[in-house]
Regions:
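Flexible "arm" and connector segments at domain edges
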Residues: 1-192
């Protein structure tokens, strides 16, 4: 599945552009960090990280939502995975704090990108930084023994079933909370 193409299709079906989402990006990212901080289950942590990535890719040109991991990173993940056989509640709490710190750094970069009159060279630099965060998130999800691409497919299924409307006052697609047939991502089949 071409995730970038899927997001483009989603935006086109709703007459939403990258540019129209940029003003609300910081608020949307903060919402995902809040969800991450409140998550009590590992799948909720994964869901918040994936939604964070989707918001970035849906608002900023040049974001690679499914980057290829460097072989050295993959090797490092495999080594760490050997040590991380079972995650306790204490481990999850510590892990979440580390991720929250990382995602907040991404929010700082997204704020800079939304500044008026920012030079293209600075946008490129911040976009590269945000792509590094996405690599970190993909690595983290893989380390947690989940297939990142399959998880993203679940997110895409959910996105495509959503009904709602674009609210230009908050620069966000507002989901219809009463929609009975809304698909919720099921990450149980995404385990490695």
């Amino acid at each position: 599945m071409d995730f970038k193409e899927e997001l483009t299709k989603w935006r086109e079906e709703r007459s939403i552009t990258l540019e129209s989402q940029l003003p609300g990006l910081t608020s949307n990212l903060l919402e995902e960090v809040t969800e991450l901080s409140r998550a009590t289950e590992l799948v909720d942590v994964i869901d918040a990280m994936l939604d964070y990535n989707v918001f970035l890719a849906n608002a900023i040109e040049g974001i690679d939502i499914d980057p290829v991991l460097d072989p050295e990173i993959v090797k490092e993940i495999e080594e760490k995975h050997k040590k991380l056989s079972v995650m306790t509640n204490e481990d999850l709490a510590l892990y979440k704090k580390s991720l929250i710190s990382l995602l907040l750094e991404g929010i700082r970069a997204s704020i800079a990108i939304t500044m008026p009159n920012i030079k293209q060279e600075h946008i490129d630099s911040f976009t590269e930084y945000l792509n590094g965060i996405i690599i970190n998130i993909k690595s983290s999800i893989t380390l947690l023994n989940y297939d990142y691409a399959k998880c993203l497919e679940e997110v895409m299924k959910a996105i495509h079933t959503r009904k709602g409307y674009w609210d230009s006052t908050i620069s966000k697609f507002v989901k219809d909370k009463t929609q009975p047939d809304r698909y919720e991502p099921d990450y149980t089949n995404c385990k490695l």
